[in-house]
């Protein structure tokens, strides 16, 4: 019973990832003038490249080591962190940071909403149940 189609999340994640990669690449030019902004760009790239990559292929080990990419709350918080990281520089970086921040807040709202179903790439590989499923037979029978 999802109000938002799953295609929206794929488009949103790819667009945020691409916008943030471009913003982080533009911050890499500060290597000689401001080392702090350059280091933030490196962290921005490290956080934004997996966002785009996860929309096409989900590595099996990534769910174990970076599970925040597989929930609305984790992704929302990482988008907010990423927006703060990439917002240094020109007007493009500020706009990209604002857009990423707004989408991060939206993902946090989606986490607490009952009407939004998580996308297929948020589920752990090999598991048929996801977080929030009530299909578990919980009889509390002791053997």
From Swiss-Prot:
Topology class, membrane: Multi-pass membrane protein
Disulfide bond annotation, renumbered to this chain: none
GO MF annotation, one: identical protein binding
Lumenal topological domain: 32-35, 89
InterPro entries linked: Golgi_TVP15
Localization: Golgi apparatus membrane
GO cellular component term, pick one: Golgi membrane
GO biological process: vesicle-mediated transport
Chain ranges passing through the membrane: 11-31, 36-56, 68-88, 90-110
Residue ranges that the UniProt entry lists as topological domain Cytoplasmic: 1-10, 57-67, 111-143
Alphabetical UniProt keywords: Golgi apparatus, Membrane, Transmembrane, Transmembrane helix
Family of this protein: Belongs to the TVP15 family.
Miscellaneous field: Present with 4540 molecules/cell in log phase SD medium.
Quaternary context: Interacts with TVP18.
Protein purpose: Golgi membrane protein involved in vesicular trafficking.
Annotated protein name in UniProt: Golgi apparatus membrane protein TVP15
Organism, scientific name: Saccharomyces cerevisiae (strain ATCC 204508 / S288c) (Baker's yeast)
């Amino acid at each position: 019973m999802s109000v938002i189609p799953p295609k929206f999340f794929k488009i949103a994640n790819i667009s945020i990832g691409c916008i943030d990669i471009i913003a982080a690449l533009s911050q890499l030019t500060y290597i000689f003038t401001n080392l702090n902004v350059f280091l933030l760009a490196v962290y921005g790239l490290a956080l934004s490249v997996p966002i785009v990559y996860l929309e096409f292929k989900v590595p099996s080990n990534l769910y174990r080591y970076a599970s925040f990419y597989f929930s609305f709350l984790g992704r929302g918080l990482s988008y907010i962190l990423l927006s703060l990281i990439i917002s240094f520089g020109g007007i493009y970086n500020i706009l990209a940071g604002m857009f990423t921040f707004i989408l991060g807040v939206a993902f946090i709202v989606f986490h607490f909403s009952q009407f939004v179903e998580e996308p297929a790439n948020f589920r752990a590989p090999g598991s048929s149940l996801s977080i929030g499923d009530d299909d578990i037979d919980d009889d509390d029978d002791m053997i």
